């Protein structure tokens, strides 16, 4: 499941997806609140979303569609509140009048450095979301 932005919707979608009998990964889209705590786009704390998954049979959670600069803060919360596998696929870019603008995005080399840091923290899966192009993934492949 991608872009889980609120807990209630996540739980409903998780139940439906698990009815397939296939393993279901859950990807959270996050940003810091005014106090700097990592939250889903709904404003619900990431730690609460992780707690809601307890006992639900989810093997992996992803920090996804989240700014590169916010990933480590998200991983701090995940490290404290999650015992399963972890993935990261961050985004880079800006929303301008409802449209993505990819001027001044992170360079492929800098994304690879960030990805290596996430891998060093123990994540299991790394990729890219909006604004992360094949060139970025090519650089990441060199540091895996």
What are these regions (language model features)?
Residues 1-144:
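Domain-level signal for soluble alpha/beta catalytic cores
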């Amino acid at each position: 499941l991608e872009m889980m932005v609120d807990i209630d919707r996540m739980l409903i979608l998780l139940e439906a997806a698990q009815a397939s009998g296939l393993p279901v990964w859950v990807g959270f889209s996050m940003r810091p609140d005014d106090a700097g705590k990592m939250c889903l786009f709904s404003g619900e704390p990431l730690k609460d979303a992780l707690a809601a998954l307890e006992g639900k049979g989810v093997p992996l959670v992803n920090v996804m569609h989240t700014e590169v600069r916010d990933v480590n803060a998200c991983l701090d919360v995940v490290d404290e509140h999650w015992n399963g596998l972890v993935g990261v696929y961050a985004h880079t870019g800006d929303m301008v009048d409802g449209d993505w603008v990819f001027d001044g995005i992170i360079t492929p080399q800098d994304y690879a450095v960030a990805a290596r840091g996430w891998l060093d923290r123990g994540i299991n899966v790394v990729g890219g979301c909006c604004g992360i192009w094949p060139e970025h993934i090519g650089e990441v492949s060199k540091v895996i």
